[in-house]
Design a protein with these regions (language model features):
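Cross-kingdom TIR/SEFIR domain
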Residues: 85-154
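Surface-exposed alpha-helical segments enriched in charged/polar residues
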Residues: 39-42, 66-69, 100, 104, ...
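Conserved beta-strand segments of the P-loop GTPase G domain that flank and frequently precede/overlap
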Residues: 23, 51, 77, 118-119
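Conserved N-terminal substructure of TIR/SEFIR domains
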Residues: 1-71, 191-218
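TIR-domain catalytic/interaction hotspot
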Residues: 53-96, 108
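Hydrophobic beta-strand scaffold residues
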Residues: 48, 74-75, 109, 115
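C-terminal interaction surface of TIR/SEFIR-family domains
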Residues: 128-217
Length: 218
């Protein structure tokens, strides 16, 4: 996939245009939607990036902000901002915090950075995060197909415009590959650095097989 690099006023690299910062919860119940986001983004010729793929030697906050700065787009899923089951019950603030960093970067760093909010239920974000009033979240209803539908809505202006049916085909093959990745890495979780990179790599290959316009740009 071709990579376009934008250079800022100071001469330093601002973002890579085909990379998307993916801000999602890292838990097993979210795995079907995790795979759907990867399949959907790769179907548009984009490359998902996430905090979990960056070496732990760097400070976490620095890693997050560095990734956001290098991405033209960021996707933020707020569907799991809820109390966890571990005592004491604590709300999960990572996703809205990372969304805040992306909004700040758009406001004072690079106005061309596009950020999108995803949720499972309509109107819930307006209640839990009222500062977002005026921003319409993309409602996926907690379903992989819903994720794919909303990804196509969010990216309607992109050069590549795969159909939901084409994205579902990519997802179907990626789910099979995910089973093999778990087996090869001897892990039960896909939320690891190596597993994430393998998923993105495989999804990119699958996408080029199914989306004709992607083959024309490679």
């Amino acid at each position: 996939m071709p990579t376009a690099i934008k250079t800022g006023r100071n001469g330093k690299t601002s973002y890579v245009s085909d990379k998307v910062f993916l801000n999602i919860p890292y838990d097993e119940k979210f795995e079907p939607l995790y795979l759907a986001f990867i399949a959907g983004l790769c179907g548009f010729g984009l490359i998902p990036v996430a905090v979990l793929e960056i070496p732990e030697s760097e400070r976490r906050l620095d890693r997050i902000f560095s990734l956001i700065r290098r991405c033209k787009i960021s996707f933020h899923d707020l569907s799991r901002v809820e109390l966890d089951r571990k005592r004491p019950p604590t709300p999960r603030f990572n996703m809205p915090f990372e969304l805040g960093l992306a909004v700040a970067w758009h406001r004072i760093g690079d106005a061309s950075h596009d950020w999108y909010v995803f949720e499972a239920k309509a109107h819930r974000v307006q209640k839990s995060l009222s500062d977002l009033n005026g921003t319409e979240p993309y409602i996926h209803r907690g379903k992989p197909r819903g994720v794919l539908q909303q990804v196509t809505n969010a990216l309607i202006r992109r050069r590549h415009r795969p159909s939901v049916i084409e994205l579902e085909a990519i997802l179907g093959h990626l789910k099979k590959a995910a089973v093999e990745i778990k087996r090869e890495l001897r892990t039960k979780s896909l939320f690891g650095s190596r597993a994430f990179k393998d998923l993105v790599y495989v999804a990119g290959i699958i996408a080029r097989k199914h989306i004709a316009s992607l083959r024309q740009t490679t």
